[in-house]
Regions:
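Short, well-ordered beta-strand elements within core beta-sheets of diverse protein domains
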Residues: 50-57, 71-78, 164, 277-280, ...
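Hydrophobic face of amphipathic alpha-helices that form TPR/SEL1-like repeat modules
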Residues: 1-46
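Glycine-rich loop-to-alpha-helix module at the N-terminal edge of alpha/beta enzyme cores
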Residues: 49-138, 149
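A short acidic/small-residue loop/turn micro-motif
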Residues: 33-34, 39-40, 56-60, 283
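ALDH superfamily catalytic-core signature
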Residues: 207, 251-392, 414, 419-420, ...
Length: 515
């Protein structure tokens, strides 16, 4: 291991990553030492080399983690919410201390460039700060009763164990969006990370363990690592988990929704995106080009909010095409941990195959390759970012391909552009570049974008935690972060107090008993 990574060993050692790691943890000192379920190998997508291995969680391990999480919940729910917020504050501070190393591990294991890896950890810090504030704002409502000498109010209580099933593309941030808000609401969390990025989860759990141990609080953060077909299925079928937050494909999200709803559990679904930018005839091209390039190329097109389609006014097409191609020539592809790299590899060989298949489908439909269009030979899962002139109705354009493929189309009338924009099954993020106020307002109105996120003069990716994140249609309808996101992690209770001497019934009903 030392020979393979040299200076990169410092990243692993700092975060408590060994050559072989256990795959289930219920808190400080609670790593279950099961080895019989086989290994999950973590592969560096930039080189194809083994980073480290993780022993998969067993059924007994899972059961042990759930039982301990249930016991932790019984105590944690009694802790005042502002005090719970102080623990999350310390989690944020610990993440500040580990930001450089954890950001590097995200880059090493997932493949996004170092700046984006650090940015993902910063998202964790930001949501921690946000959750601390929210811990003092879990507001209920009071209302007047129609009955004399009565008072009514609504209050909120924690749910219990929140299950978080996250995807490889944001291997640490998505957990924090859920776990920190769930924690200030009085819940515990069990996390099943992507089996593609298990080391990131182990590192985060180790950081959690440090904070939990230092504060002598219940073990509210737990991790179970294993294949989705085993550990994931167990989680979504487990009625002891009243809430499951799932991030992943639309196909798997539909399955999760069906299984959890059958047991009347709650879900937060963050699924596919087919995000689009409309560029009208008044757009400032000096900000359009970098916005499209970052949206399409950032994280090698593996963000849920990656820009996948551009619909440009006829009069702007040639300028946009030429300037965008020049910009793509400047994208330095290489080791995500090296300074100056703007695009790293795809996460694995399957992702490269999906990229190549999508290119072939687009070409067979009549697509014109304007830039790229091929994978890169050699070590690692590298591809060339690709621009294709296409039509919105093509099957491949209607699908989400998790890769740096950008489809460009033209329009002459804004209503036509909006119809094309909305004419896909997904509805996550959208943007319009314009200096025309009427066009901007129309795009943001009820007859405009049908997405959960709609922007003006800013791209489709790079959402901030202060606003609700999520989408419509096959994106799943879930929302994370934002002003009232805490309500998803709590149950609402209506209370009526009679402080008088009589028992009037609602709606003036009379129910006289003769004694």
């Amino acid at each position: 291991l030392d020979e393979l990574f040299g200076e990169k060993m410092d990243i692993l050692k700092k975060l408590g990553i060994e050559e072989n790691n256990y795959g289930a943890c219920a808190g400080p000192g609670q790593w279950n030492a099961t080895t019989a379920e086989g290994n999950i190998d973590s592969i560096n997508p930039a080189t194809g080399e083994l980073i480290a291995s993780v022993y998969q969680c067993s059924t007994d391990d899972y059961e042990s983690v759930v039982q301990q999480s249930l016991e932790a919940f019984k105590e944690w729910r009694k802790v005042p919410a502002p005090e719970r917020g102080q623990l999350v504050r310390q989690m944020g501070n610990a993440l500040r201390d580990y930001k450089d190393h954890l950001g590097s591990l995200v880059s090493l294991e997932m493949g996004k460039i170092k700046q984006e890896g650090d940015g993902e950890v910063q998202e964790m810090i930001d949501i921690a700060d946000f959750a601390v504030g929210q811990s003092r704002m879990l507001y209920g409502n009071t209302m007047h009763s129609e009955r004399k000498d009565h008072r009514m109010y609504e209050q909120w209580h924690p749910l219990g164990i929140v299950g978080v099933i996250s995807a490889f593309n944001f291997p640490v941030a998505v957990w924090s969006w859920n776990a920190f808000l769930a924690a200030i609401c009085g819940n515990t969390t069990i996390w099943k990370p992507s089996s593609t990025t298990p080391l990131c989860a182990i590192a985060v759990q180790n950081i959690c363990n440090e904070v939990l141990s230092a504060n002598d609080v219940p073990n509210i953060f737990s991790t179970v690592i294993g294949r989705g077909s085993s550990v994931g299925e167990t989680m979504i079928n487990d009625s002891r988990l009243p809430m499951v937050s799932f991030t992943g494909s639309t196909r798997m999200g539909r399955h999760v929704s069906e299984v959890v709803s059958k047991r009347f559990g709650k879900t937060i679904l963050e699924l596919g995106g087919n995000n689009c930018i409309i560029v009208d005839e008044t757009a400032d091209m000096d900000i359009v080009i970098p916005a499209i390039a970052f949206g399409a190329v950032g994280t090698a097109g593996q963000r849920c909010t990656s820009t996948r389609r551009v619909i440009v006014h006829d009069s702007k097409f040639e300028e946009l095409r030429d300037r965008l191609v020049r910009a793509y020539h400047q994208v330095n592809i290489g080791d995500p941990l090296e300074n100056g790299t703007l695009m790293g590899p795809l996460v694995n060989e399957n992702a490269v195959s999906d990229f190549e298949n999508a290119i072939e489908k687009a070409k067979s439909s009549g697509g014109e390759i304007l830039y790229g269009g091929s994978s890169i030979d050699g070590d690692g899962n590298y591809v060339n970012p690709t621009i294709i002139k296409a039509e919105n109705k093509w099957e491949i354009v209607q699908e989400e391909t998790f890769a740096p493929i950008l489809y460009i189309m033209t329009y002459s009338d804004l209503d036509e552009a909006i119809e094309m924009h909305n004419g896909v099954p997904q509805g996550l993020s959208s943007a319009m570049f314009t200096l025309n106020m009427r066009n901007a307002e129309k795009f943001l109105s009820s007859v405009g974008s049908d997405c959960g996120i709609a922007n003006i003069n800013i791209g489709t990716s790079g959402a901030e935690i202060g606003g609700a994140f999520g989408g419509e249609k096959e994106t799943g309808g879930g929302r994370e972060s934002g002003s009232d996101s805490w309500k998803q992690y709590m149950r609402r209770q209506t209370n009526t107090i009679n402080w008088g001497t009589e028992l009037p019934l609602a709606q003036g009903i009379q129910f006289d008993l003769s004694e």
